[in-house]
Regions:
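Non-catalytic DNA-recognition/assembly elements of restriction-modification systems
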Residues: 1-66, 199-297, 429-481
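Short, surface-exposed loop/turn microsegments at beta-strand edges and helix-strand junctions
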Residues: 69-79, 88-91, 95-98, 110-112, ...
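A short glycine-rich beta-alpha junction/loop motif
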Residues: 137-145, 178-201, 367-374, 408-431
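Short hydrophobic-aromatic micro-motifs
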Residues: 80-83, 117-120, 310-313, 342, ...
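A short beta-sheet element
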Residues: 83, 108-110, 121-163, 338, ...
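Sequence-specific dsDNA recognition surfaces
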Residues: 48-70, 85-114, 283-300, 315-344
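Conserved, well-structured beta-alpha core segment at the onset of a catalytic domain
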Residues: 130, 135, 158, 169-176, ...
Length: 481
């Protein structure tokens, strides 16, 4: 029995909180039973007793009926459709989807107003998010559940979201996940989740903390936009040229680039390079380039596991940061995995899928990135600041070059040889520092936002385990941070 875990459960208790009548050992692991014992030792309820609405995209009708009335749009339209990828990135502006008014009205059973708790069905099943108020019509995307609570519920959505993201809450949710590939969670499981009951005083403090965190996050985005505007105003890049006629002779087209497709020669690209010629520029990679480019590994899904080294994919990366990876890799995936860990000031740059996303590492981090993320290291960071370069890589200057090079592919792929030849404008060091300062202000505000949210989650966990008084005292000690 050495190394084995045993749980002794009375037969009469097997059906408790077991709506699927599971009898497997996984369901009765000690960590699950202990989490339940902690919640049930104090006042508690279930989501079923507290919600006024638990719905999803498919509540609007059969697959066939929905398909006849639903079209997902890339360009801005009447209503925004919230997806897991947007929630993970905490970005509701870039690379988002929309639906028309007729589609929004058809999807009447899954309208989102802000303040709801959204829960993943698959992918990272059970992962929860607090939906912000976007001040526009919003429709719920596929593969998400939405919970709206009663007016007289014993818990509010902010506290529910915090609880579901604590160690105890996530353990209870994890017990409800079923299936093999893909793992899923269903409505019945969501309804049965046990939740703790707290005093109004404690919950109001948590709500204020999360509001403060959201305000810091808003300020962080505003600071980043200021940095983007400095670059945009100096370079005067126009990415909205709608002209689609371009006349080229053979020496200016195929003989020069090897491309014959019309998309490659759109006037907006000519306008971009004409604007760049007004400034000092340098190629991104190559012998005389700005950076050294290194590749990571692509281990394949057979190597994915629940414990080990976090595996960062393109879907985890935005210009604002890296979301918590749900996939891990074995620690023996390669002989010396630490050589794959990105170091401080390394710029992660996506070449597949959503191409051209850049994020600069704020510190040495023990993660392994997908082969779709290149590692860029600035050769001379005193002349070209990594924060400045990262902002340029995320700007229309580089996004237009990515669009031109990868156009026409069903799955976007940006060849490393093309990435090496990306043209980067080099502004004077004073302007670079001004831009970098705004970027650093943005990330400092974001860290403060994340810290406040983390403190609120820890306070919920402490209140469950030690009582509200202990949690409030702990928060008071950190009020000056």
């Amino acid at each position: 029995m050495d190394g084995l875990e045993c749980s002794e459960v009375l037969f009469s208790e097997i059906k408790n909180d077991n709506e699927k009548y599971r009898f497997d050992s996984e369901f009765f692991q000690k960590k699950f039973l202990m989490a339940y014992d902690i919640i049930k030792s104090q006042p508690y309820s279930t989501i079923e007793n507290e919600y006024s609405c638990l719905t999803d995209f498919h509540a609007n009708g059969s697959y066939e009926h929905i398909a006849q009335n639903y079209t997902l749009l890339d360009n801005k339209d009447y209503a925004y459709m919230v997806r897991t990828t947007d929630l993970e990135a905490n970005d509701f502006v870039n690379n988002v989807k929309y639906v028309s008014k007729s589609t929004y009205d058809f999807l009447s059973k899954s309208k989102v107003f802000g303040g709801e708790v959204l829960i993943n069905k698959i992918g990272s099943p059970g992962r929860s998010f607090l939906m912000p108020n976007l001040n526009m019509p919003v429709s719920l995307g596929m593969n998400l559940f939405m919970i709206r609570l009663k007016n007289d519920a014993t818990i509010d959505t902010t506290t529910l979201w915090l609880y579901l993201n604590t160690s105890i809450g996530s353990t209870i949710v994890k017990r409800k996940i079923n299936g093999t590939v893909p793992l899923t969670i269903d409505k019945a499981a969501i309804k049965s989740i046990y939740i703790p009951c707290f005093s109004n005083v404690f919950r109001n403090i948590l709500i204020m903390m999360v509001k403060a965190a959201n305000e810091k996050d808003k300020q962080a985005k505003e600071s980043y936009v200021k940095a983007e505007n400095i670059l945009r105003n100096i370079l005067e890049i126009n990415q909205n040229n709608s002209s689609n006629i371009s006349i080229k002779n053979m020496s200016e087209s195929f003989l020069d680039s090897g491309r014959l497709d019309a998309e490659y020669y759109q006037p907006k690209y000519d306008e971009l390079f004409t604007s760049l010629k007004k400034h000092t520029t340098q190629l991104l990679g190559g012998k005389d380039g700005i950076v050294i480019i290194k590749k990571s590994i692509e281990p394949g899904s057979d190597s994915y596991c629940d414990e080990g080294i976090p595996f960062v994919r393109v879907s985890n990366v935005t210009k604002y940061g890296i979301s918590e990876p749900s996939i891990k890799l074995p620690r023996n995936i390669v002989a010396e995995p630490d050589k794959l860990y990105p170091k401080r000031n390394t710029i992660l740059f996506s070449k597949d899928g959503s191409v051209g996303i850049a994020y600069k590492m704020e510190k040495d981090t023990e993660v392994i990135t997908s082969g779709a993320l290149l590692h860029l290291t600035v050769k001379n960071p005193l002349e070209i600041l990594p924060d400045y370069l990262t902002l340029v890589l995320n700007s229309p200057i580089v996004q237009l070059q990515a669009e031109r090079d990868s156009n026409g592919a069903i799955i976007q792929h940006w060849k490393p040889s093309d990435i090496e030849n990306v043209v980067i404008p080099i502004l004077d060091i004073k302007t670079q520092r001004e831009i970098a300062s705004k970027v650093q202000d943005s990330f400092a505000l974001r860290r403060k936002s994340e810290q406040l949210s983390e403190y609120a989650k820890q306070a919920v966990e402490m209140a469950i385990e030690q009582g509200e008084d202990a949690a409030l005292a702990w928060l008071k000690e950190r009020s000056g941070e």
